[in-house]
A protein has these predicted regions:
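Pan-zinc metallopeptidase signature
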Residues: 266, 272-358, 362
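Active-site His/Glu-centered metal-binding helix of metallohydrolases
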Residues: 192-201, 255, 259
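Hydrophobic alpha-helical transmembrane segments in multi-pass membrane proteins
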Residues: 216-222, 232
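Short pre-active-site segment immediately N-terminal to the catalytic Zn-binding motif
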Residues: 129, 176-190
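Short helix/loop segments within enzyme catalytic domains
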Residues: 130-133, 137, 141, 145-147, ...
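A short alpha->loop->secondary-structure connector
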Residues: 171
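Hydrophobic or amphipathic, alpha-helical segments that drive membrane association/targeting
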Residues: 2-167, 281-282, 334-338, 348-373, ...
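Catalytic Zn2+-binding segment of zinc metalloproteases
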Residues: 196-215, 224
């Protein structure tokens, strides 16, 4: 591959490529198979948006037909390295090296379509006219993480405290548990940002593989049926598949946590939502002794705790999760990207008041409330009494 100083992208997954890079580090496609000068994010045949949003109004950030997403800013792009946990990529490479898992993933991606997976969700699809406050919060999170297309969002009561990202190599969708819709503002943005991080990191396919191989049992473990059952030869064979999937699942959650943290940029919000989510209770987290919790966080790298997490959980333990988030907030990567995000998401300044030569502007001497007087009402008068319009003040001047 040759370059002329311009950025080039993988023709399959649109990852940024380095000069003379023989293959894409994200999807493994040889660069000779296709290099795109710019990442194409829309459908050129879309009659609604024209492909890259040219037919949409400036206020429309997502195409309802092809799901094209308007970038946060012109040429805005966020590399996956900005939030991906290093062990996450290593664990995915391990999964790809396991023949049965790779075969299952290829079969799932090639034969089981996304609509079939979506049909199994048993939920309500969100949109501009269906729970719009959640939908548009999801659109914002997707734009912050520079997704090219907007994933479908569903709300389901099947697993009320769960949040899933499923799909294949090319398309994904997100299922939000009904209880989690109680989150508002930055708390909801963090939750949705996590799921957009799963999409951006290519987790949807392997999440779907876990659904098919391991089922939907929460917190599946390789010793979940006891030590004697663990020593069963059939169980050992099953664990050979489960163990790498569980290891990847734990690392994938750290990547998602970092993506959500990058979306909101507020450590207190991240810690609160992770605590509420892990405990499956909103009020219980507020009753926790934070000093005692910090002691647990400091001890979370203990070898015995790490072994317990490895054998007993497909999600990271809360204390370790909080410690890793604390470390991420201290990195220059997060600080630098938050400066960029805040620059492009900052609300525009309020318009300056238009000067009207026929109006006298003054403030109440008691409460400071702004007042406006028409000059015509003062015509021929040297003095006039006016009353502050503030009901709580009412001072005569």
């Amino acid at each position: 591959m040759t370059t002329t100083g311009a950025i080039t992208y993988c023709g399959r997954c649109q990852e940024v490529l380095l000069a003379d890079q023989p293959f894409c580090t994200r999807c493994g496609t040889a660069t000779a198979a296709g290099v795109a000068a710019m990442p194409h994010t829309g459908d050129w045949n879309c009659v609604t948006c024209g492909g890259n949003g040219v037919k949409l109004t400036p206020k429309q950030n997502v195409c309802p037909t092809c799901r094209w997403l308007r970038p946060l800013a012109p040429d805005y792009y966020m590399p996956i390295e900005a939030f991906q946990w290093a062990f996450d990529q290593q664990a995915m490479d391990t999964l790809r090296s396991i023949g049965p898992l790779t075969a299952a993933a290829n079969a799932l991606s090639g034969r089981v379509s996304r609509p079939w997976l979506e049909a199994s969700v048993n939920g309500v699809r969100l949109g501009p006219d269906q729970l719009p406050e959640i939908f548009f919060a999801a659109v914002h999170s997707a734009r912050v993480l520079a997704l090219p297309r907007m994933p479908e969002i569903y709300v389901s009561g099947e697993q009320m405290w769960d949040c899933m990202t499923l799909g294949g190599d090319n398309e994904a969708f997100i299922v939000v548990g009904s209880v989690l819709t109680a989150l508002k503002g930055p708390d909801l943005a963090f939750l949705l940002g996590r799921q957009m991080g799963h999409v951006a990191a290519g987790h949807a396919l392997w999440k779907s593989v876990m659904q098919f191989i391991s089922g939907r049992a929460q917190n599946r473990t390789i010793m979940g049926q006891g030590v004697l059952q663990f020593l069963n030869p059939a169980k050992i064979l099953e664990s050979a598949i489960d163990a790498p999937l569980m290891a990847w699942a734990r690392h994938a959650e750290i990547t998602a946590d970092r993506a959500g943290a990058l979306t909101v940029g507020n450590k207190a919000v991240v810690r609160r939502v992770l605590g509420q989510w892990s405990l499956k209770s909103f009020p219980l987290y507020n009753r926790l002794n934070q000093a005692a919790l910090e002691r647990d966080v400091a001890m979370s790298d203990d070898s015995q705790i790490a072994l317990s997490e490895w054998t007993m959980s497909s999600t990271p333990y809360l204390a370790r999760r909080l410690r890793l988030i604390d470390e991420y907030f201290e990195t220059e990567t997060l600080k630098g990207w938050r400066a960029i995000i805040e620059h492009w998401t900052r609300p525009p300044p309020p318009p300056k008041p238009v000067h009207d030569p026929n109006v006298i502007r003054l403030n109440c001497v008691a409460c400071g409330n702004p007042m406006r007087l028409q000059k015509k009402d003062m015509a021929g008068k040297e003095k006039a009494k006016v009353k502050c319009p503030n009901d709580k003040c009412g001072k005569m001047m």
